[in-house]
Amino acid sequence: TAYYDAMIANWFNKKLKIEFPERKTIFGRKLQQLRYGENPHQQSSIYVNDYNDKHLKFDQIHGKELSYNNYNDMFASLEILNSLKKNSGTVIIKHANPCGVSENKVPLISFKNAYASDPISAFGGVIACNYKINKKIALEINKNFLEVILANGFDKDALNILKKKKNLRIIDISNFNLKNLSSIKTFDGSFLVQSKDNIVIDKKKLKCVTKLKPTKKELAEQTGRGRKSTTK
């Protein structure tokens, strides 16, 4: 009954566009019991909100069950991917931090450039692409060890190639939508809630207010908000 009442309350908040009500109920349905958390000694599960019809709209086509760290890296990759142009973006994540990001109207070049950014860190990482994976890209992917590949679809030849690696988790994100979600951080019975930082930056609308002007290379970077640290 409490679960049902909470769903009704959240539905009305959404309908009335009340993003931050005086009382907020956070609840979820267990989607999966995970083997362990960030470390082997930690327990972990993943939950989803039934009132949000856009939650985790992706399909796992192949591979082992997703782990806590897989999900964490996937979420980080999708947040950055959301800021890149459609059908051109590639993001590589390791330990929730980007180690390769690229945009190119030719998907194969986009993939190669992203991987070339830091091939050592990319080892055992997660790759997210907002384009469809074809045979040529699949052959490049299989040259490397990766935990997860997320993409906006896979053609038949690509799937046949990728499935040769039995442990590679293949995720179709064709129906995934990151917009209109909230970000929540918890600590000791309290939680911080904010709207998601999913604005796509329009360089034409940027205004420099300092004497030092950014270079074209600096403006091209889309990974700042995806980093856990800005130190080098």
What are these model-predicted stretches?
Residues 3-232:
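ATP-dependent carboxylate/acyl-activation modules
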